[in-house]
């Protein structure tokens, strides 16, 4: 049987696999904000990125290792392909963290070996022990993944796993890379690994899965029953294609059905000991932060964190809930951090009151960031009678999107009505040469006119593919959250902003999307799965020695 830590370890890969969602690219400050919140949430491991991808990715992982890596905090992990260049870059990036891990991988399915790696099984059997041993010479905590394990020949898979453990791997990850398996198949795969790998008792079994068939969470729960003790997941289930296994769904399934799962941990069914170390009351805030910063809107009927997750429309259901919530609710909304708390902050509230409330909400801002947040708070308070926690969340989350901005919006002025053509006047500052230009455009509506004017000024070709707006809170003076997604060269970039004026919010969101596009094209990143190992050269290391 594999090594059993006595509970489930939560491995969060929002900043690595989650960021690979189309349009979900994050800047350094955004990644730091999410990493800090993941630490508050209580995840065991943060996979901070793929350091070899680009100098920007290396810097982000290194900064997270410095700022978030603590003795009593999460393990900071980086991803590396099974090559010395990748592994060395990963080690250098995570080295500042007291608790660090190198996560290296290679594909084991025949379809990947033939068409992607152009390698034989014999090649893989040589590469795995050599690269795991090299990683082990740098750090003690090594995770090894057999990419596309669920479509690999079982006997070959067992052989690869045995070699990886013998070379020093302490965690063996079994990915369902394309979301192919069903729960019973995935559970049997984990059980068979436990039976057929002689040294599996020296490593923790981890699972990683995608949601292409909508089965990722179900697969993971079946894996837990068969001995998996680390779950690799993302906030809101974001990730490539249909996404990854959802952290909040997994955690709350284990929380709500603890009496069922306790027996698989050799506990009494009524044992009160939690199955994870997650602080569930941080779930909603974490979900909103990730949604705001990535621009990936959470569907209303999403389990646990969707807007309708605790809503009841049916009169029969409403009557039952009013009499006893347990009639139709299996989770207390407060357990995941939802509350009806409305604070009495307004235009007369001072800096200390705002700081105190932000600290209560878990935000630890520097003096400079607090000054910026307070200025935004006062501006909003002049336009809105009451400031709620959701308003403060919107202020803080938008604030961390500002760094690395080539363009800054200076002026938005719109004229529209049923008897006139919508016209927008926009002034845009180019921070690279400190020049400001103004353009006027006509559109089919005020937002279209704003986007046309911004395109004239920015001169960054793109296609607008999504515009959405939703209310942050109730009331006619509520903040409107706007998400805009643009496309260029088959890549998608998101922008997000909130304002009491949705046209101003749309303008800011569009500028944010343009800034992401420009910044992303400067990064010139490589993809951990799609780019060949031949890209793993020492050139990167020489440029990032410091």
UniProtKB/Swiss-Prot annotation:
Domain of life where this protein originates: Bacteria
GO molecular function: 2-isopropylmalate synthase activity; acetyl-CoA C-acetyltransferase activity; manganese ion binding
InterPro entries attached to this UniProt entry: 2-IPM_HCS-like (IPR050073), 2-isopropylmalate_synth_dimer (IPR013709), AIPM/Hcit_synth_CS (IPR002034), Aldolase_TIM (IPR013785), LeuA/HCS_post-cat (IPR054691), LeuA_allosteric_dom_sf (IPR036230), LeuA_bact_synth (IPR005671), PYR_CT (IPR000891)
Pfam family, one: LeuA_dimer
Subcellular location: Cytoplasm
SMART domains the UniProt entry points to: LeuA_dimer
Names of the cofactor(s): Mn(2+)
Alphabetized PROSITE patterns for the sequence: AIPM_HOMOCIT_SYNTH_1, AIPM_HOMOCIT_SYNTH_2, PYR_CT
This protein's UniProt keywords: Amino-acid biosynthesis, Branched-chain amino acid biosynthesis, Cytoplasm, Leucine biosynthesis, Manganese, Metal-binding, Transferase
Pathway: Amino-acid biosynthesis; L-leucine biosynthesis; L-leucine from 3-methyl-2-oxobutanoate: step 1/4
Limits of the Pyruvate carboxyltransferase domain: 8-271
SUPFAM superfamilies referenced in this protein's UniProt entry, alphabetically: 2-isopropylmalate synthase LeuA, allosteric (dimerisation) domain, Aldolase
Region annotation (Regulatory domain) ranges: 408-546
GO BP term, pick one: L-leucine biosynthetic process
Annotated Mn(2+) binding sites: 17, 208, 210, 244
Catalytic reaction(s) noted: 3-methyl-2-oxobutanoate + acetyl-CoA + H2O = (2S)-2-isopropylmalate + CoA + H(+)
Subunit structure: Homodimer.
NCBIfam families: leuA_bact (TIGR00973), PRK00915.1-3 (NF002086)
Family membership: Belongs to the alpha-IPM synthase/homocitrate synthase family. LeuA type 1 subfamily.
Role this protein plays: Catalyzes the condensation of the acetyl group of acetyl-CoA with 3-methyl-2-oxobutanoate (2-ketoisovalerate) to form 3-carboxy-3-hydroxy-4-methylpentanoate (2-isopropylmalate).
Name of the protein: 2-isopropylmalate synthase
Provenance organism: Prochlorococcus marinus (strain AS9601)
Phylogenetic lineage: Bacteria, Bacillati, Cyanobacteriota, Cyanophyceae, Synechococcales
């Amino acid at each position: 049987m594999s090594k059993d830590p006595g509970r489930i370890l939560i491995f969060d890969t929002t900043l690595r696999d989650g960021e690979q969602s189309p349009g979900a690219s994050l800047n350094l400050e955004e990644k730091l904000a999410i990493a800090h919140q993941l630490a508050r949430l209580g995840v065991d491991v943060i996979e901070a990125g793929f350091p070899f991808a680009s100098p920007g990715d290396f810097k982000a992982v290194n900064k997270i290792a410095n700022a978030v890596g603590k003795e009593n905090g999460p393990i900071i992990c980086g991803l590396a392909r099974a090559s010395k260049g990748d592994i060395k870059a990963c080690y250098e990036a995570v080295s500042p963290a007291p608790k660090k891990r190198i996560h290296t991988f290679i594909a084991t399915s025949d379809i990947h070996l033939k068409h992607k790696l152009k390698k034989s099984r014999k090649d893989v059997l040589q590469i795995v022990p050599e690269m795991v041993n090299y990683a082990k010479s740098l750090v003690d905590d090594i995770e090894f993944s057999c990419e596309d394990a669920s479509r690999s020949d079982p006997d070959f898979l067992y052989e690869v796993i045995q070699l990886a453990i013998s070379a020093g791997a302490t965690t063996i990850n079994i990915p369902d890379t394309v979301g192919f398996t069903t729960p019973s198949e995935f559970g049997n795969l984990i059980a068979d690994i436990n039976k057929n790998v002689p040294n599996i008792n020296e490593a923790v079994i981890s699972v990683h899965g995608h949601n292409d068939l909508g089965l990722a969470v179900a697969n993971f729960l079946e894996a837990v029953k068969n001995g998996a003790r680390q779950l690799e997941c993302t906030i809101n289930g974001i990730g490539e294609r249909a996404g990854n296994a959802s952290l909040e769904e997994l955690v709350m399934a284990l929380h709500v059905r603890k009496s069922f799962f306790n027996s698989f941990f050799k506990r009494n069914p009524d044992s009160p000991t939690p199955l994870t170390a997650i602080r569930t009351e941080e779930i909603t805030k974490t979900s909103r932060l990730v949604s705001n910063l990535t621009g990936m809107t959470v569907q209303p009927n999403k389990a646990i964190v969707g807007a309708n997750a605790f809503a009841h429309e049916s009169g029969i259901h409403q009557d039952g809930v009013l009499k006893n919530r347990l009639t139709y609710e299996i989770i207390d909304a407060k357990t995941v951090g939802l509350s009806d708390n409305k604070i009495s902050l307004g235009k007369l509230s001072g800096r200390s009151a705002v700081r105190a409330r932000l600290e209560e909400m878990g935000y630890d801002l520097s003096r400079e960031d607090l000054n910026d947040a307070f200025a935004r708070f006062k501006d909003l308070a002049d336009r809105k009678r009451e400031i709620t926690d959701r308003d403060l969340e919107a202020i803080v989350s938008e604030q961390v999107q500002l760094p690395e901005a080539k363009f800054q919006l200076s002026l938005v002025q719109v004229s529209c009505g049923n008897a006139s053509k919508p016209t927008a006047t926009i002034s845009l500052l180019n921070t690279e040469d400190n020049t400001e230009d103004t353009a006027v455009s006509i559109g089919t509506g005020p937002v279209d006119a704003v986007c046309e004017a911004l395109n004239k000024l920015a001169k960054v070709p793109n296609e607008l593919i999504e515009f959405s707006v939703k209310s942050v809170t109730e009331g006619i003076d509520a903040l409107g959250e706007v998400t805009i997604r643009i496309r260029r060269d088959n890549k998608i970039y998101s922008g997000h902003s909130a304002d009491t004026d949705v046209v101003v919010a749309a303008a800011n969101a569009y500028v944010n999307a343009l800034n992401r596009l420009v910044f992303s094209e400067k990064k010139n990143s490589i993809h951990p799965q799609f780019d060949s190992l031949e890209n793993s050269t020492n050139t990167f290391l020489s440029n990032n020695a410091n």
